[in-house]
Amino acid sequence: ANPSSLVVADMPYLSYHINISDSLKNAGRFIQEGKADAVKVEGGEKRKEVIKALIDAEIPVMGHLGLTPQSKNLMGGYKIQGKTLDLAKKLFEEALLLQESGCFAMVLEGVPTVVAQSISENLTIPTIGIGAGKYTDGQVLVIHDLIGMKSKEYIDAKFVKRYGEQYDATLKALLEYKKDIESLNFPTEEHSYDMGSDIQDSLKEW
């Protein structure tokens, strides 16, 4: 549908955690059936062998470090990563490891600005930040957050900036739709199909 864009499929939880064989099959389906151009895998050193196997199978891989949502339970929730010197060093080392393993790009999520900046400046592959400050090579936000698909009562993460209030617009439209149906104001003749009057009369007589 969009031949000029690079489509990266985010591999779901457990699709690359069990063994290399399953990981290859699942990633291969994204490429062959889903028409993705690449896949994204969360994690650092523990994902090294999977990443290498995918790349050996000619499947481009994007890495993902920092706050990795699929590991949030082990992390104690959605918490910023790399806030101590030792943890920042570990992130830096894992970023280099992913680059050496063959990743063509990397997402850095939920890490201090200075950590993401240091990693970005020392890698030769591009970094994409989400909650990682402004010094990464690119930026991303979840589309639902960006356009405001959730109620204002929902507390967004600190790094989210709403560029719209789609929730309000959607709710307004749905309520108007409901009202029109209940009052028989929709559908009208404008939204309905007709047939020839002679056929219509014959149908009524039949």
Predicted regions span which residues?
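Alpha/beta enzyme core
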Residues: A1-G164, D168-W206
